[in-house]
């Protein structure tokens, strides 16, 4: 075949590799403290614009409902929503009327949102490729992003597999204390007043 005499292979990026612009962090928590840790992190990051990934539609709705009830600018995105509801949620999220989108992986497929600051794994996915795909939604176009995971002791073994696939270490950090949250919010408020 005269077409394949000197083939050239072109590769764009590496399959299932993380971006260098994303900082990966995990927080080791008790399973019962997962929601409180999420709230603490959101409070610590007032300018957050991100997606919280949950395992199930039910968990997605519960987390979003709890965030809304607690005064956060959030909404859910999952398969039980009608197409009109999904479109409305995505429109509000893209226009930044919402800071937090709580979603399942299936519902979030194909959505493309610019300038996400954070991806939060409320639960680690079972497959490392899903983690890579989730984290790749932030840190795009020369911007930096953060992918954080709330894990409990039964999920610790997954971190090593993800690190191997990423080719980098996932930092371990402590959930911010109430004092740290207050200080951060105070400094953020002062910065806004000075502008």
PLM feature segments, named:
Residues 1-195:
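Conserved helicase RecA-like core
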């Amino acid at each position: 075949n005269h077409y394949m005499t000197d083939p050239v292979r072109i590769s764009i990026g590496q399959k299932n590799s993380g971006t260098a612009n994303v900082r990966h962090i995990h927080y080791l928590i008790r399973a019962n403290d997962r929601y409180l840790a999420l709230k603490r992190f959101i409070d610590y990051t007032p300018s957050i614009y991100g997606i919280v990934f949950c395992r199930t539609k039910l968990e997605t709705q519960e987390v979003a409902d709890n965030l809304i009830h607690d005064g956060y600018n959030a909404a859910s995105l999952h398969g039980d929503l009608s197409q009109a509801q999904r479109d409305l949620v995505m429109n509000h999220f893209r226009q930044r009327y919402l800071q937090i989108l709580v979603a399942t992986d299936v519902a979030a497929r194909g959505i493309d949102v610019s300038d996400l600051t954070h991806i939060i794994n409320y639960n680690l996915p079972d497959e490392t490729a899903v983690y890579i795909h989730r984290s790749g939604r932030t840190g795009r176009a020369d911007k930096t992003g953060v992918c954080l995971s709330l894990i409990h002791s039964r999920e610790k073994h997954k971190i090593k597999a993800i690190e191997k696939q990423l080719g980098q270490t996932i930092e371990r950090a402590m959930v911010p204390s109430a004092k740290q949250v207050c200080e951060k919010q105070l400094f953020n408020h002062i910065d806004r007043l000075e502008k």
